[in-house]
């Protein structure tokens, strides 16, 4: 579950452990851990287009959730994301979300 703390620009990830305790950590920490795991699995192999891979992993769910939150209102979604509507439409098309 992703939450944004009030009065903060830090997105957090909430997790529940086996004792039903909820912990929160910044989204960037989860991304960093995912990248560490990814690099560990590479065993020294070269990687191409890592930026695009990571961006797609974050951008697609971001678009999905923003479009759900705005009930499909592209103008409002673009404003929330700080991009113009044409750019939003292009990104939605890229991920087959149009």
Curated annotation (Swiss-Prot):
Pfam families in UniProt: HTH_8 (PF02954)
Domain of life: Bacteria
Keywords per UniProt: Activator, DNA-binding, Transcription, Transcription regulation
GO molecular function: DNA-binding transcription factor activity; sequence-specific DNA binding
Residues annotated to bind DNA: 74-93
Record field: transmembrane: none
Family membership: Belongs to the transcriptional regulatory Fis family.
Function text: Activates ribosomal RNA transcription. Plays a direct role in upstream activation of rRNA promoters.
HAMAP family assigned to the protein according to its UniProt record, in alphabetical order: DNA_binding_Fis
Self-association state and partner proteins as the record states: Homodimer.
Record protein name field: DNA-binding protein Fis
Source species of the chain: Sodalis glossinidius (strain morsitans)
Gene: fis
